[in-house]
């Protein structure tokens, strides 16, 4: 039984209405109400065995469980996509309910699934979470390659980063009545996603091309920064965007929604200290904004376009912190 939580208009609900029908699975449709209490009632009464949701909604369920215990042990797996699932979320779902989180990557143009994350039988000395954090391997029929800005093919070594491009029988080759540079001359779809592919064929997304931050000629992944920040006990949500900087061209701005009871004034300094031994030092943001809410798109992703517009319009109270663990500079 599938609990259908992706929006019906989001990449054809990730293909679940079709795969569910083809496999003969029952489907539970939640309607427009995706709040915690309504989902709790549906899960407890229907006891579905599979569901899919964006990380934002999965985070809401984890928070609901902290208020009143929620039993998700009925699920054999939870599929998540739309944006990267933080490692803290993957581990929390496993530790609380012994349920694996399976990441997927795709888009409407790929009908919609192209990559699915299942750890290999041989973990190669890594943890299971390490493999679940990856976007996964291409599903049969899909090819993936990594290209640089000049159109050169890059190595699949798990380290070299470039634009991910796709090709396959169900990958679209054009847009109706629209001229676009989204396709290469040799027929590959330019996804606009930045990432790498390792020797085993596992794809790892690091950012969207429009979201990656170039500071002093070096790339900073907003996705990776967000993943580390979410491990801090005081952070409920975080979005990282670029802001202009006279010396470095761009620097990361961390926009944080803290958990209740936290000191918003002291939090940026605490988070800088938290980051300093977990990421490269030049990745540590000096620009911070602590907010009551982070806007979402209609499919539950952080609305970074709206956040960038808010920054440009001066609507965010941005603090600059250069010290660690204390005060503004």
Regions found by a protein language model. Give the residues of each.
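Conserved ATP/PPi-binding loop(s) of AMP-dependent carboxylate-activating enzymes
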Residues: 134-141, 152-185, 218-220
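Acidic/polar alpha-helix N-cap and adjacent early helical turns
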Residues: 309-329
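Gly/Ser/Thr-rich phosphate-binding loop
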Residues: 22-25, 48-53, 62-130, 143, ...
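Active-site glycine-centered loops adjacent to acidic/histidine catalytic or metal-binding residues
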Residues: 82, 106, 136, 193, ...
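Conserved AMP-binding/adenylation subdomain of ANL enzymes
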Residues: 1-5, 9-49, 64
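AMP-binding/adenylate-forming catalytic core of the ANL superfamily
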Residues: 51, 168, 173-174, 194-283, ...
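AMP-binding/adenylate-forming catalytic domain of the ANL superfamily
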Residues: 277-302, 320-327
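Conserved beta-loop-beta connector loops within the AMP-binding
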Residues: 141-165, 199-200, 262-268, 303
């Amino acid at each position: 039984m599938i609990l259908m939580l992706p929006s019906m208009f989001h990449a054809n609900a990730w293909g679940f209405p079709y795969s569910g029908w083809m496999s003969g699975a029952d489907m539970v449709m939640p309607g427009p109400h995706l709040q915690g209490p309504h989902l709790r009632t549906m899960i407890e009464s229907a006891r579905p065995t599979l569901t899919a949701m964006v990380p934002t909604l999965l985070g809401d369920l984890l928070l609901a469980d902290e208020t009143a215990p929620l039993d998700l042990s009925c699920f054999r797996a939870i599929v998540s996509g739309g944006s990267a699932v933080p490692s803290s979320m993957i581990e929390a779902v496993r530790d609380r309910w012994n349920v694996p989180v399976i990441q997927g990557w795709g888009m409407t143009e790929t009908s919609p699934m192209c990559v699915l994350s299942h750890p290999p039988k041989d973990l190669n000395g890594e943890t299971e979470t390490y493999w679940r954090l990856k976007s996964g391997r291409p599903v049969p029929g899909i090819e993936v390659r990594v290209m640089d800005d000049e159109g050169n093919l890059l190595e699949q070594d798990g380290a070299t980063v470039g634009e991910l491009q796709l090709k396959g029988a169900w990958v679209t080759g054009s847009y109706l009545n629209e001229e676009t540079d989204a396709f290469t001359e040799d027929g590959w779809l330019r996804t606009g996603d930045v990432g790498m592919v390792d020797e085993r064929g596992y794809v790892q997304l690091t950012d969207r091309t429009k979201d990656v931050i170039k500071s002093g000629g070096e790339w900073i992944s907003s996705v990776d920064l967000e993943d580390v920040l979410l491990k801090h006990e005081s952070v409920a949500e975080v979005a990282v965007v670029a802001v202009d900087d006279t010396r470095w061209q761009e620097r990361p701005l961390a926009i944080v929604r803290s958990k209740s009871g936290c000191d918003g004034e002291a939090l940026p300094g605490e988070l800088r200290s938290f980051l300093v031994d977990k990421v490269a030092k030049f990745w540590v943001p000096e620009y911070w904004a602590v907010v009551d809410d982070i806007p979402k798109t209609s499919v539950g992703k952080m609305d970074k376009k709206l956040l960038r517009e808010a920054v440009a319009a001066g609507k965010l109270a941005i603090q600059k912190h250069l010290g660690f663990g204390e005060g503004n500079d």
